[in-house]
Amino acid sequence: MFPRDVRIESYDPELAKAIAAETQRQEDHVELIASENYTSPAVMEAQGSQLTNKYAEGYPGKRYYGGCEYVDIAEQLAIDRLKQLFGADYANVQPHSGSQANQAVYFALLQPGDTILGMSLAHGGHLTHGAKVNASGKLFNAVQYGVNDQGLIDYDEVERLALEHKPKMVVAGFSAYSQVIDWARFRAIADKVGAYLFVDMAHVAGLVAAGVYPSPLEHAHVVTSTTHKTLRGPRGGIIVAKGAGEDLVKKLQSIVFPGIQGGPLMHVIAGKAVAFKEALEPGFKAYQQQVVKNAQAMANTLIARGYKIVSGGTQNHLMLVDMIGKDVSGKDAEAALGKAHITVNKNSVPNDPRSPFVTSGLRLGTPAVTTRGYVEQDCVDLANWIADVLDAPSDDAVIARVRDAVSAQCRKYPVYG
């Protein structure tokens, strides 16, 4: 029997110390990594529940284990809410991550060696869209498209590559692109060569759910996402579709289980159900609208301070700062900003002369700060502090001044009040 009064603090003080330190770091540092956000206490409560004890291979009503009647309720809630959120008629909430959701789509619809056409990682795509270092670039013949000199997706290039290489699947989506994607144009290109259109909307799923960013579900054969980032849920993946035929649904269901996964993480699925309920609340739309307003305020301020934003600005939650020609690298900028309690990530930019471990760019995003309660003026201030540090990354006095300002701002907007 486990006594209920045993806590990590008393049983494992080393781990407790690390958890406490990370909790404090999240309160004291401003989070600008575009793929990060804060979950609600209710989501964390679900993730820490006894549902973690239950093995539940299969799907609701069709399990390979007994005793699943209550986890069936939890998973069905997640499925139904997810469908409602995106206007989908198919939803799978079992993928452990966005990468595994993407893997499921590839394995369901392709054969090893088939050609896929995806966005280059160096131009704003994702590892799982055909990067050579990823399984998607090893198992499949990956052809990559990019952005033009204005930092915009070159749809003419996408079409030319599609007509030349005849991919079986066109992949749309990104990890570092700040404009609106023309999903209809992608579908038209895919249709020209008889390819599936697969959309990875991981970064903008919350914006899509709130109607702040165009939905790909009207155009794509299948769509995946993570459940954190702008959706503000637990770390995990989902697959959704609208108008998918019975054959496609059967392939997707069977590839997730038993194809690439065994037992689902029922505690995480419960957390997803909570997050989807939160995303259906009226306030979620206002939150996502503010995310975009904050990103635009930050981008415009950085531009005014002399920093280039790839594509010239942002229409979503993120921006890519291009520092080619600047004395500071992305790696050094990340470190300097970290000393000022501003958390960002270095990121390659188009035609980057530096290696992916060094880079000439920074990716910034506003989902997390908006969750804290930041509005436009806060993000203008924050962008000016970022520019101050980037202008003098080795100046300890500047870093100390910015750190003090950031600390005051963080105290004004606690993550968990």
Curated annotation (Swiss-Prot):
GO biological process per UniProt: glycine biosynthetic process from serine; tetrahydrofolate interconversion
Pathway this chain belongs to: One-carbon metabolism; tetrahydrofolate interconversion; Amino-acid biosynthesis; glycine biosynthesis; glycine from L-serine: step 1/1
Reaction(s) catalysed by this chain's protein: (6R)-5,10-methylene-5,6,7,8-tetrahydrofolate + glycine + H2O = (6S)-5,6,7,8-tetrahydrofolate + L-serine
Sorted UniProt keywords: Amino-acid biosynthesis, Cytoplasm, One-carbon metabolism, Pyridoxal phosphate, Transferase
Calcium in keyword set: no
Needed cofactors: pyridoxal 5'-phosphate
Modified residues (N6-(pyridoxal phosphate)lysine): K229
GO cellular component: cytosol
CDD domains xref list: SHMT
EC number: 2.1.2.1
Top class in the EC scheme: transferase
Subunit details: Homodimer.
NCBIfam families per record: PRK00011.1 (NF000586)
Classification via HAMAP family: SHMT
Name listed for the protein in its UniProt record: Serine hydroxymethyltransferase
UniProt source species: Stenotrophomonas maltophilia (strain R551-3)
Gene: glyA
